[in-house]
Amino acid sequence: MLWDVFPKESIAGGAPMNVALHLQHLGLDVKMISKIGDDKSGRKLLSFIEKFGMSEDLIQIDNEFPTGSVLINDEDKENIKYEIVKPVAWDHIQWNQQIDRESRIVDAVVFGSLAARDEESRQTLFKILDSPVLKILDINLRPPFYTADLLDKLLTKADILKINEDELTLLANFYDLPNQMDGALEKLSELFSFELVCITLGSNGAAIYQDGEIIKHPGYPVSVKDTVGSGDAFLAGFIYKYLSKESLEKTLDFACALGALVATFNGGTPQYKAEDIRSIMDM
């Protein structure tokens, strides 16, 4: 959990927190494992998630390192520059008995690659990933914070992989995947024995690969205000329906609708109602 710091404002964000808040908003009981600094920024983040009713039980406070932030320069809209500040508090998430207990009784653990950029949080993450629960990897590749070895270890631990087109291209270079998307997803799934792979395709919707079958959705045409957090909303919608044992077709439809809905707002975690999602699906 962190702050996206723009020249004129700071917005609470970070992909894991966005996904967690959407899942909480959809009615699931979510606990986020993270760490904030003992500072004003950290306290403001706690106040922010409190509005969503999400538990703070597994959020640690660091007395040495500051709350996480990403410095964003968006003067050139075609070439937005950002710096993921390091080191920060969430690089130093410590393993404890509470995390051990909670990670064994949940329905699913959702994780990304950035949580593994520092040794301390990386060790904690891989202990969590030893838990016998569904593990969903939102890979969220951000150079220079990953290596081929780290990717191997993360992918090996995942049951479900969520990626976008750019990330598939990067993985194709690492693992010599076919150029065609369907073939690349098939080989990737075979390499790591995934339960399924989910890929977002921007304005072209999304697709799911499972057991030799690919299911595609064209997405929903909406008037876009802000795509920040749209992919996170998509993943939350996917997880929500997947854990509810819905069909993959219905799961993908709901996920695309929620991603499209969030793109019609400013910010990654807007307030919305169930009927807002249904109105998108009825288009």
Each PLM stretch: what is its role?
Residues 7-14, 40, 66, 145, ...:
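Residues at secondary-structure transition points
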Residues 33, 84, 217:
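Hydrophobic residues at beta-strand termini and immediately following loops
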Residues 1-55, 59:
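Glycine-rich phosphate/adenosyl-contacting loop at the front of the ribokinase-like
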